[in-house]
Amino acid sequence: MGYAGIAGIAFVESGFLVGFFLPGDSLLFAAGFLASAGTIDLELVIIAAFLGAVLGDSFGYMLGFRLGPKVFKKENSFIFHKSHIERAQNFYEKHGGKTIVIARFLPIIRTFAPVLAGVGKMKYSAFVFYNIFGGLLWTISLTVLGFILGGIFPNLHNYILFVILGIIIISVAPTMIGVLKNKQYREYIKKHWKNLLNTQKSPE
């Protein structure tokens, strides 16, 4: 994947409304784990992830600032649901600017928090402060944790692919379970699945 890939994933997950499904936490942990084996450089991983995350949040802020309330009118789809916005909005109203920092460690909310900060016209200087602080805290803590555990359990490097796969599954599982439990998501999937089957059955 490389450092550019790490930065890219951190950027998309933080800055795009459809990036919430990307496994940012597990990516940083796995990158730190690989760094402990000398496969990649820990400092460069942190720099790449930090830049991607901070720039992504800034993009999300500008998106919300320019679109304003239109964000709340976006139609539901398989990869976007208004409930994600509402969940992040409730969290933002409760914690204010600190949401930008706290949300770094909360999948889904992490993606929508900067957008809501833009919609709410948070003072940009305050947003930048929380954004940089949260980005540093997130990237350093997760990559260093992976690095430390990689040093404690060096034999796990022989099974690195299984370790990464396991981390991704654990990271993505809560989101997938939430999707399956959501009635509107299930109805959306059923509707489009039936349309797909009908299209395949229709004569040419």
Where would I find each of the regions flagged by the language model?
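Membrane-interfacial helix-loop-helix
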Residues: 1-8, 33-126, 151-163, 174-204
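Short, amphipathic, aromatic/basic-enriched membrane-interface segments that mark the entry/exit
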Residues: 15-21, 100, 128-136
